[in-house]
UniProtKB/Swiss-Prot annotation:
The gene is CYP505E5. Residues 500-641 form the Flavodoxin-like domain. This is Self-sufficient cytochrome P450 monooxygenase CYP505E5. It comes from Aspergillus niger. Residues 467-491 are annotated as: Disordered. FMN binds at residues 506-510, 585-617.
Length: 1050
């Protein structure tokens, strides 16, 4: 272009370019100063590379046109790829890993999912408020540090279910934050130094890599912890681990998961903490605005727990946050590059691949947009009625288009909540009234050295605040996250009425959920759902004999992924006449996207009408920024849609809406198929669970349950428990054979596993409920694996295992699955794998509650096996114990009674036969039922012979099971207890004894006395413990006849 103008800027020096023009501590402010001098577009040279900056709304509006420009990863962000690689924030344009992650994660950040995170956000925000309240109003608060703690804890808890508990360490920031701050600062430094200078900064490079590894190690630990979780929650981390890309069908690699966990932890807290810090700086600097904001919170919320509906009714708080981000965008810029050579602003030529930096602190103060007072803090300019009038792309603190921040809704809800909660609770004053704002720069910006004091408002106290938060926690959710899927009672079969078709456009799942809800409501009114599908399914396929309801939204000004074909079809102008089609449109949007608010719903509505379709009802709308989407849908349904349908399409069986029976569907329940494989199983419902041990001790649990029917159980008897395999083990199998959990497997031949023939079974159900996955491989299994091995070295190693089978495979419990993972060259069909697995068997546990103690109830006391595998790598998870540990109150499981051997029951004459019970750890279970049965006899005033319990464990505060309950039984005269503590033998009641064998020696006289009275001795525990006990007693008592010395070894 001959008339293209040279881009202005300071003259660069040889070698160093403009490096000397940049303040190393305040580089951003130096660059902003260039904007004042050189105008809306300027360039500087750093490290021999030209850097262009745009500083006006008009230029930014051009640069945000995704048909011409796409994101560029430059300077500090490019250095940050050492940490996060192709994570959402640092990926190059078009990177495949970014595409997979983006498509998987966008639905997980939909408005309904974000709203359901409000309770966890409130939990952390309450921790902050309690800390400030307990410190008192005279304490100087480093607000930026506390907001960093808050936002880091919030993102970790809400997206990954991981508690960092940063507020419990007030001395230092979390190690992740310390590493992050160094990496962000160093990335900025490296980006502004010549390559040769960076190459000689050996110590800084080494420290950089050390901090990167520390952050990746923490992310890896979070992932590993989740994979151990037997009941993972449906959160963002679960989506990362298990989500599938709808385009490629692939999941995310482990490296990509780590990259994006780190991206969330950084991007999810760093910018939000800066936003909150600047917001409160501005509020304290403008007391009249602070007062007005506080009045809005008082009028809307009062002292109630803040709900999602409250947040939608705080427009002034919303405006304050927008204005704070306008003046101090905490992520101060983003870069784009043209897809081909472009002319910018009508006069500057930008070559393809040349990055252009959008300098937000300058753009967002453009006086041509925000007026002569653009440098001043005026939230009123950001109220909805003014915000909607701004020119396109005037406010871009969250980036642009498909590379914009997908966590925007999360950050905004969190910021609204925290501002509202703090204003609800405190009056704020500056710690130093003379403080002048200083900016701390890394790749983001925050106030430096800003401190406040927080004084409790309206007579509130720290104790009262604590009590209020506990009441909220006890009473349940404060958020508007009600379950919109009402319970189906199935009292009546559905009648066939007027059919209705529903089509939706949905990226995040919100409009899809609304469509399902509306279809459910319509069914309850006598209509029949004919179709419920994405809009693209409606191309050339709109029915004419029934109403068509469309629910959709706009995504970055464009149709959602599943509505693009439909909109393109309407826009061609070649659509056949839609005459005879009756339709209604319901649109969702967010008023912050002023230029594209409801664009696609309006477009569809207009184009269908122009093509001859009949508009049944006025278009419905829901603004996600200020309302509850489901409530808006319901209101439109009642006031617009239903009246139109009744007038034009009255269903043949029209009924009134019954909220207790919304679906009017008929259903039946049956027991799981796996239950039919075992005779005599009884259904049980868990009524109570608790952990009996301290966190740093191998876990033991108590599980109480109720059941119906007579089982003829007696103290000392057993239960056969029908378990399922640990989810983490099942996931290993699915990954090994590249199966999704809901893949169907159909067995078409007879099998010994009891699998249904010619009936599809999901892969997760098959491997969870029907087969043993951790059984040691047999010799025949090894032969088959050797034959299926492609690698000669692997074949040799497998032959070595075969030759040493007993010691390496059998004794170390190496399974077929372990071998498949260890030797990837084995090519084993899944049918062959299944044929190698034995059927899943029941596991036996002792009762720990006497049937007479609480009729129709019982309990189990068990150790949860989660220990390093004997094979030398990985974890060994006990199948049944981990299954039982996953159950919660209300859970259903299945058992069958199994009598103990006759001698392992209480004496037939309890009044004349003393008993001595000896056990360690969970071996206490049967003896607890013995003692309870004796307690019942005691309460019936029946005489009892003496009973001694010798119980061994690690220590009083570690795993002294049922200490309080046993003490009560002892006080009632039912039993005398003698303890041994292996870790704390000097504890008074242990009498210096580490093991029960030692305690038997100290009580020798009492044992001899009881033995002479024809006592029965019962022993329950491990083989080693039982051998030690037997040796002591034989030495003390002589021969031990089996009718008087009864053991149960596990």
């Amino acid at each position: 272009m001959k008339d293209a103008e040279r881009i202005p800027g300071p003259k660069p020096l040889p070698v160093v370019g403009n490096l000397l023009d940049i303040d190393p501590e305040h580089g951003l402010q130096s660059i902003i100063a260039f904007a004042d001098k050189y105008g809306p577009l300027f360039q500087i040279t750093i490290n021999g590379e030209k850097q262009i900056f745009a500083t006006s709304q008009a230029l930014v509006d051009e640069l945000c046109d995704e048909s011409r420009f796409h994101k560029a990863v430059v300077t500090g962000l490019e250095v940050l790829r050492l940490l996060a690689h192709d994570g959402l924030f640092t990926a190059y344009h078009g990177e495949r890993g970014w595409g997979i992650a983006h498509r998987i994660l966008v639905p997980a950040f939909g408005p309904l999912r974000i709203r359901n995170m409000l309770d966890d956000m409130s939990d952390v925000a309450q921790q902050l408020c309690l800390k400030w309240a307990r410190q008192g109003g005279s304490t100087s608060i480093n607000i930026t540090e506390d907001f960093t703690r808050l936002t880091l804890d919030t993102i970790a808890l809400c997206t990954m279910g991981f508690r960092l508990n940063s507020f419990y360490n007030n001395e230092t920031m979390h190690p992740f934050v310390q590493s992050m701050l160094y990496v962000l600062k160093e990335a900025d430094v490296q980006a502004n130094l010549p390559g040769i200078a960076n190459s000689i900064r050996v110590s800084a490079q080494r420290r950089m890599h050390k901090n990167i590894e520390a952050m990746r190690t923490m992310a890896r630990g979070i992932i590993q912890e989740r994979r151990k979780n037997k009941n993972p929650v449906d959160d963002i981390l679960n989506t990362l681990l298990n989500g599938r890309d709808p385009v490629t069908g692939e999941g995310m690699s482990d490296d990509s998961i780590i990259d994006n966990v780190i991206t969330f932890l950084i991007a999810g807290h760093e910018t939000t903490s800066g936003l909150l810090s600047f917001t409160f700086y501005f509020l304290i600097q403008h007391p009249h605005i602070l007062k007005k904001a506080q009045e809005e919170v008082d009028e809307t919320v009062g002292l109630a727990q803040i709900s999602a509906q409250h947040l939608a009714e705080l427009p002034y708080i919303d405006a304050i946050l927008k204005e704070s981000l306008r003046l101090m965008p905490t992520a101060p810029g983003f870069a784009v590059t043209p897809k081909k050579t472009e002319v910018l602003g009508g006069k500057w030529m930008i070559n393809a691949g040349q990055p252009v930096n959008v300098l937000l602190p300058a753009c967002l103060r453009d006086q041509s947009v925000f007026g002569p007072d653009a440098d001043e803090f005026h939230p009123e300019r950001m109220l909805a009625e003014n915000f909607s009038k701004l020119p396109p792309n005037s406010w871009k603190p969250f980036g642009n288009g498909e590379r914009g921040c997908i966590g925007r809704a999360f950050a905004w809800q969190e910021a609204q909540l925290v501002v509202a909660m703090i204003l609800q609770t405190f009056d704020l004053v500056p710690d130093d009234p003379s403080y002048q704002l200083r900016i701390k720069e890394t790749l983001t910006i925050k106030p430096d050295g800003f401190r406040i004091r927080a004084l409790l408002r309206r007579g509130q106290t720290a104790t009262g605040l604590s009590r209020r938060s506990m009441l909220v926690a006890r009473d349940g959710s404060s958020g508007e996250s009600s379950n919109h899927l009402a319970e189906a009672r199935g009292d009546h079969a559905p009648a066939r009425g007027q059919p209705v078709s529903f089509f939706y456009g949905s990226n995040s799942g919100t409009c899809k959920a609304l469509a399902h809800q509306l279809a459910s409501n319509m069914m309850s009114r006598g209509y029949t759902t004919q179709k419920l599908a994405p809009l693209d399914n409606a191309v050339g396929n709109l029915p004419r004999d029934q109403p068509v309801i469309i629910l959709t939204t706009t995504y970055d000004g464009q149709p959602t992924d599943d509505a693009k074909k439909f909109v393109a079809w309407l826009e061609t102008g070649n659509v056949p006449s839609l005459q005879g089609i009756s339709y209604a449109v319901f649109g969702c949007g967010h008023h912050d996207w002023t230029q594209t608010f409801y664009r696609i719903p309006i477009l569809i509505d207009d184009l269908m009408h122009k093509a001859g379709a009949t508009r049944l009802a006025p278009r419905g709308a829901a603004n996600a920024a200020v309302s509850d989407l489901f409530s808006d849908l319901e209101a439109w349904e009642e006031t617009s849609l239903l009246p139109a349908l009744r007038e034009n399409f009255l269903p043949s069986n029209s009924t009134d809406f019954d909220p207790l029976n919304p679906h009017q569907i008929q259903l039946s329940l049956s027991k799981p198929r796996r239950v039919d494989l075992h005779k005599g199983l009884i259904e049980a419902k868990v009524t109570a669970v608790r952990v009996l041990t301290s966190p740093d001790t191998p876990e033991k649990r108590h599980l109480e349950f109720c059941f119906q029917g007579d089982t003829s159980l007696r103290p000392g008897d057993h239960l056969n428990i029908l378990p399922v395999n640990p989810p983490s083990t099942v996931s290993r199998v699915l990954a090994q054979f590249n199966l999704a959990p809901d893949y169907n497997i159909t067995v078409n031949s007879f099998n010994t596993l009891g699998l249904p023939q010619a009936t599809p079974v999901s892969a997760s159900e098959l491997f969870s409920s029907y087969v043993e996955l951790c059984q040691p491989a047999t010799r025949n299994n090894l032969k088959a694996l050797i034959a299926a091995t492609q690698s000669d070295p692997d074949k040799q190693e497998l032959n070595r295992l075969y030759d040493s089978y007993e010691f390496i495979v059998r004794d170390k419990r190496v399974s077929v699955l372990d071998l498949l993972e260890q030797f990837p060259s084995i090519s084993l069909p899944i049918a062959a794998f299944i044929s190698m697995l034995p059927a899943l068997r029941v596991r036996t546990y002792s009762l720990s509650m006497a049937p007479s103690f609480k009729p129709s109830h019982s309990s189990l006391t068990f150790s949860v096996i989660n220990e390093p595998a004997w094979r030398g790598s990985g974890q060994h998870l006990g199948v049944a114990s981990n299954y039982l540990a996953s159950l919660t109150s209300g859970s259903i499981f299945y058992f069958s009674p199994r009598p103990a051997k006759e001698s392992f029951h209480l004496p037939k004459d309890p009044s004349n036969t003393p008993i001595i019970m000896i056990c360690a750890g969970s071996g206490l279970a049967p003896f607890l039922s013995f003692i309870q049965d004796r307690m019942v006899l005691k309460q019936q005033y029946k005489p009892l012979a003496k009973a001694f319990l010798f119980f061994g464990c690690r220590g009083r505060s570690l795993d002294d099971l049922y200490h309080e309950e046993l003490s009560e039984f002892e006080a009632a005269g039912v039993v005398e207890i003698r303890r041994a503590y292996s870790k704390t033998p000097d504890f008074d009641i242990a009498k210096g004894c580490r093991y029960v064998q030692h305690r038997l020696v100290t009580e020798g006289q009492a044992i001899l006395s009881l033995w002479s009275q024809n006592a029965t001795i019962y022993v329950c525990g491990s083989t080693n413990m039982a051998k030690g006990v037997e040796a002591v007693l034989q030495n003390m008592l002589g021969p031990l006849p089996k009718e008087r010395y009864v053991t149960e070894i596990f």
